[in-house]
UniProtKB/Swiss-Prot annotation:
The gene is rpsP. This is Small ribosomal subunit protein bS16. InterPro entries: Ribosomal_bS16 (IPR000307), Ribosomal_bS16_dom_sf (IPR023803). Keywords: Ribonucleoprotein, Ribosomal protein. GO terms for molecular function: structural constituent of ribosome. GO terms for biological process: translation.
Length: 87
């Protein structure tokens, strides 16, 4: 199963995260399939490639709770559900 989750990057006490599509069996900071964006909790900087997220959700990927919260902040889940209802 593919999950949309955060991959921890940066140094000790100065972490930032990449939003990635990864196999659920892979380690948190290990191998991933595709990078979808990034999130920096210190500067509150968030960038997400919406079209890539929509592609992975269509393919059946499951977002983790944390990534789902970030997607809701950017209204990505709402846009995805509206897009699916149109089709």
């Amino acid at each position: 199963m593919v999950k949309l989750r955060l991959k921890r990057m940066g140094s000790k006490f100065n972490a930032f995260y990449r939003i990635v599509a990864a196999d659920a069996r892979a380690p948190r900071d290990g191998r991933f399939i595709e990078e979808l964006g990034y999130y920096n909790p210190f500067s509150k900087d968030l960038k997400i490639e919406k079209e890539l997220v929509f592609k992975w959700l269509d393919l059946g990927a499951k977002p983790t709770e944390t990534t789902k919260t970030l997607f809701k902040k950017e209204k990505i889940m709402e846009q995805y559900h509206q897009k699916r209802q149109k089709n």
